[in-house]
A protein has these predicted regions:
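Short, flexible helix-loop junctions that flank or precede catalytic/ligand sites
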Residues: 1-175
Length: 175
């Protein structure tokens, strides 16, 4: 279930320390901010560091309809660079959108897809938790270890044609 208060968090993390595999949900903007949310709920740093092994953040986005997907000429390399694409990536990428067809009920979308990020709570992350690193500091450490953000995954999905620019903005704009 969802961890809504300190008591529930403490029970879940203590169960994890005794060898139980614990899955739970917590509303946060991204994986690194989960750590600071637990700290803000009053959970001791040592408990978070010792009990957490992996944090997954996710968003659901509508998938471009593969039957009516067309190039999105409104999305030019400048727009893609504003999203964080390199100049080279932006010049090679081709954005798509669904124009609408009977198979997608004229919406341009067919199905949903997950956009994820996975934070491995490694030794450097555990050490950062113990020294009460901020969310940006945790993210920076994780990125150095190969962490891919939801924005990174979203950009790959735009480049592959599965996700359109507007849906990326709708789902990830507050990030």
């Amino acid at each position: 279930g969802e961890m809504r208060d300190k008591e529930t968090v403490d029970i879940g993390l203590k169960a994890a320390l005794t060898g139980h595999l614990v899955f739970s949900t917590l509303h946060t903007n991204d994986a690194p901010s989960t750590i600071t949310r637990l700290q803000n709920m009053g959970t001791p740093d040592y408990l978070i560091s010792a009990a957490c092994q992996l944090v997954v953040a996710q968003r659901l986005a509508r998938r471009n309809c593969s039957d009516c997907k067309i190039p999105d000429d409104d999305v030019n390399p400048k727009v893609l660079q504003d999203l964080g694409f390199s100049a080279e990536q932006a010049s090679r990428a081709k954005a798509f959108k669904g124009k609408g067809c009977p198979k997608c009920n004229d919406t341009g979308y067919k199905g949903r897809q997950g956009i994820y990020e996975i934070l491995v709570v490694s030794k450097p992350i555990k050490e950062a938790i113990l020294r009460q690193a901020t969310t940006p500091e945790l993210r920076e450490i994780a990125v150095k270890e190969g962490f891919q953000t939801m924005q990174d995954m979203g950009k790959r999905m735009i480049a592959s044609g599965d996700l359109n620019f507007r849906e990326y903005e709708r789902v990830l704009s507050s990030e």
